């Protein structure tokens, strides 16, 4: 079994963190996805901020009985701190729409579209957003040779935090015939663009700023690099010419709007070294809130501290009727 996998959990774990407050917030964390640990780390700072803001807070580590538990708890708002399957992919927003409980972050369709790399790519290209060349490969295709000229990137369709992402360079001892499709029967094979990794934080439709990621150890921005201190430097704001920086913000707001996102999001790009051409990678509708996460860092640069960021996210809580 691979290290990061979705697993089924029958019962939710519920803890009261604060029993008094102006509104009752259910902080939804953990869950059953491969990104469970990231969600738990994100929830630590979020829970402290919610209590500091004067909310009544109930911590819920989500299991399959979540609908019953929500009926028992009766929160005013759900703060969706889940990452990955069941939380970020539209499942939880869909349930909360049915239950008519306001929730933070993007809605069901926006979350589902952004989480699925095939459908988000179709949506991006339909709206004239530039992306690298890619193809879909099915396990049943039984491809024995490289499906694309090296270097290329292998991406699972529905994983976040770069889980399962592999970059295959010309010199690598890699045989595609041996690839075991650990995260589903389809993958995206994407042209590798050599360039600068840029990330933009968007909050309630407004781009707050951009930063550049400088890799210090690994060859690409993988799970280990994202969540291990000392594996990457964040240059905030991104050291770009003013016109290019502004273009990056405008493009991010365009993606956010066309995907009908809500609350916080993080748009990811590669700036090709030779041509200065921007390539969109994805938009993350449930960005991390860990000490190493990008959205809180950019928000701080824009003058919004972590507690105020959480308050702004809460203000946009709603359900889709």
From Swiss-Prot:
<keyword id="KW-0436">Ligase</keyword>
<feature type="domain" description="ATP-grasp">
    <location>
        <begin position="121"/>
        <end position="315"/>
    </location>
</feature>
<dbReference type="GO" id="GO:0008716">
    <property type="term" value="F:D-alanine-D-alanine ligase activity"/>
</dbReference>
<dbReference type="GO" id="GO:0071555">
    <property type="term" value="P:cell wall organization"/>
</dbReference>
<dbReference type="InterPro" id="IPR000291">
    <property type="entry name" value="D-Ala_lig_Van_CS"/>
</dbReference>
<protein>
    <recommendedName>
        <fullName>D-alanine--D-alanine ligase</fullName>
        <ecNumber>6.3.2.4</ecNumber>
    </recommendedName>
</protein>
<keyword id="KW-0464">Manganese</keyword>
<dbReference type="GO" id="GO:0009252">
    <property type="term" value="P:peptidoglycan biosynthetic process"/>
</dbReference>
<feature type="binding site">
    <location>
        <begin position="147"/>
        <end position="199"/>
    </location>
    <ligand>
        <name>ATP</name>
    </ligand>
</feature>
<feature type="binding site">
    <location>
        <position position="268"/>
    </location>
    <ligand>
        <name>Mg(2+) 1</name>
    </ligand>
</feature>
<dbReference type="GO" id="GO:0046872">
    <property type="term" value="F:metal ion binding"/>
</dbReference>
<dbReference type="InterPro" id="IPR011761">
    <property type="entry name" value="ATP-grasp"/>
</dbReference>
<dbReference type="Pfam" id="PF01820">
    <property type="entry name" value="Dala_Dala_lig_N"/>
</dbReference>
<comment type="similarity">
    <text>Belongs to the D-alanine--D-alanine ligase family.</text>
</comment>
<keyword id="KW-0133">Cell shape</keyword>
<keyword id="KW-0460">Magnesium</keyword>
<comment type="function">
    <text>Cell wall formation.</text>
</comment>
<keyword id="KW-0479">Metal-binding</keyword>
<dbReference type="InterPro" id="IPR016185">
    <property type="entry name" value="PreATP-grasp_dom_sf"/>
</dbReference>
<feature type="binding site">
    <location>
        <position position="284"/>
    </location>
    <ligand>
        <name>Mg(2+) 2</name>
    </ligand>
</feature>
<dbReference type="InterPro" id="IPR011095">
    <property type="entry name" value="Dala_Dala_lig_C"/>
</dbReference>
<feature type="binding site">
    <location>
        <position position="282"/>
    </location>
    <ligand>
        <name>Mg(2+) 1</name>
    </ligand>
</feature>
<dbReference type="GO" id="GO:0008360">
    <property type="term" value="P:regulation of cell shape"/>
</dbReference>
<keyword id="KW-0961">Cell wall biogenesis/degradation</keyword>
<comment type="pathway">
    <text>Cell wall biogenesis; peptidoglycan biosynthesis.</text>
</comment>
<dbReference type="InterPro" id="IPR005905">
    <property type="entry name" value="D_ala_D_ala"/>
</dbReference>
<keyword id="KW-0963">Cytoplasm</keyword>
<keyword id="KW-0573">Peptidoglycan synthesis</keyword>
<dbReference type="Pfam" id="PF07478">
    <property type="entry name" value="Dala_Dala_lig_C"/>
</dbReference>
<dbReference type="GO" id="GO:0005737">
    <property type="term" value="C:cytoplasm"/>
</dbReference>
<keyword id="KW-0547">Nucleotide-binding</keyword>
<dbReference type="InterPro" id="IPR013815">
    <property type="entry name" value="ATP_grasp_subdomain_1"/>
</dbReference>
<feature type="binding site">
    <location>
        <position position="282"/>
    </location>
    <ligand>
        <name>Mg(2+) 2</name>
    </ligand>
</feature>
<dbReference type="GO" id="GO:0005524">
    <property type="term" value="F:ATP binding"/>
</dbReference>
<keyword id="KW-0067">ATP-binding</keyword>
<dbReference type="InterPro" id="IPR011127">
    <property type="entry name" value="Dala_Dala_lig_N"/>
</dbReference>
């Amino acid at each position: 079994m691979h290290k990061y996998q979705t697993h089924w959990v029958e019962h939710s774990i519920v803890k009261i963190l604060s029993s008094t407050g102006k509104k009752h917030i259910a902080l939804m964390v953990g869950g059953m996805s491969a990104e469970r640990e990231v969600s738990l780390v994100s929830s630590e700072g979020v829970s402290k901020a919610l209590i500091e803001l004067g909310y009544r807070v109930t911590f819920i580590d989500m299991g399959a009985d979540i609908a019953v538990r929500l009926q028992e708890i009766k929160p005013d708002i759900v703060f969706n701190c889940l990452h990955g399957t069941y939380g970020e992919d539209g499942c939880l927003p869909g349930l909360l729409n049915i239950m008519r409980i306001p929730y933070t972050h993007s809605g069901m369709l926006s979350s589902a579209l952004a989480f699925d790399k095939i459908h988000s790519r179709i949506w991006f290209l339909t709206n004239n957003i530039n992306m690298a060349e890619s193809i879909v490969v099915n396990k049943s295709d039984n491809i024995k040779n490289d499906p694309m000229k090296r270097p290329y990137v292998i991406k699972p369709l529905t994983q976040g935090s770069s889980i399962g992402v592999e970059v295959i360079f010309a010199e690598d001892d890699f045989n595609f015939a041996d690839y075991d499709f650990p995260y589903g029967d389809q993958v995206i094979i994407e042209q590798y663009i050599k360039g600068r990794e840029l990330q933009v934080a968007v909050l309630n439709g407004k781009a707050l700023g951009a930063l550049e990621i400088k890799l210090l150890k690994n060859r690409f921005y993988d799970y280990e690099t994202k969540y291990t201190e000392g594996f990457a430097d964040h240059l905030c704001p991104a050291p770009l010419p003013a016109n290019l920086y502004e273009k990056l913000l405008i493009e991010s707001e365009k993606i956010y709007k066309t995907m009908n996102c809500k609350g916080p999001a993080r748009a990811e790009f590669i700036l090709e070294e030779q041509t200065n051409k921007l390539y969109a990678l994805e938009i993350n509708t449930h960005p991390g809130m860990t000490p190493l996460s990008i959205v809180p860092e950019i928000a701080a640069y824009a003058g919004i501290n972590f507690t105020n960021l959480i308050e702004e996210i809460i203000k946009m809580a709603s359900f889709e009727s």
